[in-house]
Amino acid sequence: MPADYTSTARALSLPTSPSESLSPADNDSYPPWSHLASGRSNPAHPSERPTLWKQVTHRLNETSQRMMAIWRRLSFWQKVGAAAAALLANLLGIGFLVFTGKVFIWLGPVAEQWEQSVVAYTVLWLCVFFVSFPPLVGWSTFGTISGYIFGVWKGWFLYASATVLGSTCSFVVSRTILSKFVNRMMERDKRFAALALTLKYDGLKLLCMIRLCPLPYSVCNGAVSTFPTVQPLMYGLATAIVTPKLLVPAFVGSRIRLLSEKGEEMSAGSKAVNIISIIVTVAIGIFTGWYIYKRTMARAKELEAQERADIRRSLQADHADRRPHHSFSEDPDVNTAATTLARDEEERLGFHDFDDDNVDLAIDDESGGENSPRLQSGGPYRDEFTDNDSDDVFKNGDGGEGETYGLHTHVRKS
């Protein structure tokens, strides 16, 4: 009866057990984009851009967690060595500050005499020049001393000229010494190769931004020299363009001398103006360096994304047409960097796994005789069986003792 059939079908369609919530393991079985879609469709959590304070605290928390994870992985003696190194660095920093203060106290009586001395000017210029080579330090201190002895403009010219020439020479020497290291990095490190490409196509602008960043001076000279796409003249030009920032230490040095020589004669207001000018100048320099650093990192990531997109399109086009990848640039340094990124992109796209259509079966006669199928055909052996071939492939046995064959797979280049 139809009525009984309908009621029976409805009864069978009911669940035999109450519905249960999915376990975490069941949730993990769903594809990841389903979670993303549900997250986007939830109106209870509107997307809001985090404030600067939240970004800073989040970054500090991430850094502290990363440092704690590294610390927990260290052995006992590694922890002892790390603690000793941190203590030594703090002691050296305090000692350097004390030494710098003693230098200005010692320079007080002789600053007026040395201001017109050519020998003092030359010696200080050479000091700035030589601290350009890593791992020497004291570049900022010499800039302040230049302003302390020779005033703002004369001290700035000394500081700027020695900085430009010193950084260029340091760049050339570091590149010569670190050439083997550069080659290894270009072939193995995809991040290094990406930054090398960004410096090639947006070189001068990005170099100027790097020179404005608050990075260790001599170490920066050696680090940038490892990028083969940066030329020495371009690096020297970028350093010369940003020399106006060197007015900051020269100005601070001149204000320190003014306060030390005429501090007793100044009124409280004049002292306050000079001290505030020093603080404001230093604060502007720090803020500018931090801002430029953030912009530099953002620009580097943007250029790297563009380079990767171009390489990805080239790889996809070559793979679709089944043709080999040609060189990316006539410049060998650029081509090496692009090839390193191309290998990384191939792994991401899955092109490193060759399909069966690109694999040929070749049987090479290891005896090297004239009857080798490879020698007769002039290329790899390919199976060309047809439906009409009904011979038993096992009827001839294993063959003679001298007929030994090697089985290899060859990947077609075309």
From Swiss-Prot:
InterPro entries: Golgi_membrane_TVP38/TMEM64, VTT_dom. Belongs to the TVP38/TMEM64 family. Residues 147-256 are annotated as: VTT domain. Residues 112-117, 179-232, 293-414 are cytoplasmic. Residues 12-24 have a biased composition (Low complexity). Residues 1-90, 139-155, 254-271 are lumenal. It is found in: Golgi apparatus membrane. It is a multi-pass membrane protein. One of its GO terms (cellular component) is Golgi membrane. Residues 1-10 have a biased composition (Polar residues). The keyword Repeat does not apply. The keyword Membrane applies. The VTT domain was previously called the SNARE-assoc domain. As there is no evidence that this domain associates with SNARE proteins, it was renamed as VMP1, TMEM41, and TVP38 (VTT) domain. It comes from Aspergillus oryzae (strain ATCC 42149 / RIB 40). Keywords: Glycoprotein, Golgi apparatus, Membrane, Transmembrane, Transmembrane helix. The chain crosses the membrane at residues 91-111, 118-138, 156-178, 233-253, 272-292. PANTHER family: GOLGI APPARATUS MEMBRANE PROTEIN TVP38, GOLGI APPARATUS MEMBRANE PROTEIN TVP38-RELATED. This is Golgi apparatus membrane protein tvp38. Golgi membrane protein involved in vesicular trafficking and spindle migration. Glycans are attached at residues 27, 61. GO terms for biological process: mitotic spindle elongation; vesicle-mediated transport. Residues 1-28, 317-336, 360-414 are annotated as: Disordered.
